[in-house]
Amino acid sequence: MKSNIDIVVLKDEYPGDRLRYFLRSVCKFIKFVNNIYIIVKNHEEIPNWLNTRDNIILLTYDDLYRSCGEEISKNIIEQYIPTIQGLTERFIYFSDSVIISEPCEIEQFFNNNKCCIFSTTKFINPKKYNYDENIMYHNSKYINRLCGIKMHKYEYEYINRGIIPLYKSPYKLLGITNNDEFDIRLYALYLQKHGYSNFNTILIKKLVIDE
């Protein structure tokens, strides 16, 4: 049964059929999906095997952002996802590196009007961890302290970029403009701090295989 929840997937520029397997897994295991928006860099990136149906809509970077010829990254494109015409208020953002491995229900993505956060736990070597890990470790400590989550001294949780349930209105309201690889993750943390998100539903159960 379809719902008022769309899926947005950003196709990676790497060659291969990851998008094909992602779509197959969605059609098999996420029965409630309304429309699927596939964002590709340009028309040359559209796979020749892809047959668009009524609920599969193709978009290019230029459809979302007029670049005037300059090179743009997918991090910028992510900021313009809420401008997609017809996109539902609740939607799920996917990377095409994800494969859904079992049947999913709406409540596993949106619970009590809150979007659930998929996180991954990583342990670090305190003698070898690098600058980025240092930032993520201390950010994770702060967020987990806000949420009442206890963590091991040398571990941190970071948001899995492969799958992020989102609300369109607060995303647009936040107005992220920074071209940074953590932008969309910071948006999810912003929602968590302001009471939109829920850490509890999917933290333990493994639904996806993320490369």
State where each predicted segment sits.
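N-proximal low-complexity "stem/linker" segments adjacent to membrane-targeting elements
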Residues: M1-R18
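Short catalytic/ligand-binding loop motif for oxyanion handling, primarily in non-cytosolic enzymes
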Residues: D17-R18, E44-W49, I99-C104, Q108-F110, ...
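Short, acidic, metal-binding catalytic loop of nucleotide-sugar glycosyltransferases
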Residues: S25-V33
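Short beta-strand/loop segment that forms part of the nucleotide-sugar
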Residues: V33-H43
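Active-site-proximal specificity loops/subdomain of glycosyltransferases
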Residues: K41-L87
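Short beta-strand-to-loop acidic/aromatic patch adjacent to the donor-nucleotide binding site
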Residues: T88-S101
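Conserved donor-nucleotide/metal-binding helix-loop-beta segment in metal-dependent transferases, i.e.
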Residues: E102-D132
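Catalytic core and acceptor-binding pocket of nucleotide-sugar-dependent glycosyltransferases
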Residues: Y129-E211
